[in-house]
Each structure stands twice: as structure tokens, then as C-alpha cells.
Amino acid sequence: MLARQLIPAIRDELKKLDAEPRGARASGRRAAMWRAQQHAVRRGSTVDDLRRYCLQSLRRRRFLEAEDENDYLRGYREGFQAVLSQIRRVETQRV
């Protein structure tokens, strides 16, 4: 399955963020979703590629322990987690 099929779901999540109050956390979520969307639009990118990209982004050392994490980084992590949730949702509907 091509990752492009997830772009409408990612856009829906971004629209929901537009309705929320602006702040560092929302900005971090938006940044993560934009990055995931840009990865999904690449030619030949599969859902597995997108999942791997999100998981690699979550593993990076820039993420601190929960108590030391600032709002932007927390939102960034939550954004990638939201994309992973969309991937799971699409895959379970497909089966």
C-alpha cells in the first residue's frame, strides 16, 4: 500500500490542529505531521516506509526524558504518534 493514501488522514489531523489554540505543543505536532506528509508524498513511498520514518523520528536522541521535555518536543512526538495511529487504523480497516 502506498503512503500517499494516508495523506487525506494526515490533512484531517492538521485541520483539527488549526481549530486548537496556538502554542508550542500544537506547533510541534504540526511540524511532525508536515514532515510525515512530505515523506508520504515521495514517489514509491509505502506505508511501511512511512512507519519506519515515524519510528526513526521518535527514536532520535533529541527527545528527552518526559519530565525534561519541552512543549514543542512533546507535540513533535505526539504528532508522529498520531500518524502511526492513522497507519494502524488504515491497516485494520483493510484487513
What is each PLM-predicted segment?
Residues 3-6, 40, 54, 64, ...:
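Compositionally biased, intrinsically disordered low-complexity regions enriched in proline and serine
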Residues 16-27, 42-45, 62-74, 92:
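Charged, low-complexity interaction regions
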Residues 1-2, 93-95:
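Terminal, compositionally biased segments
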Residues 35-49, 79-94:
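Amphipathic alpha-helical coiled-coil segments
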Residues 1-14, 26-30, 42-59:
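Short amphipathic alpha-helical heptad-repeat segments
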Residues 6-9, 22, 38, 94:
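Generic low-complexity segments that are intrinsically disordered, proline-rich and/or Lys/Arg-biased
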Residues 27-28, 32, 75, 79:
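Periodic glycine anchor positions in long extracellular repeat architectures
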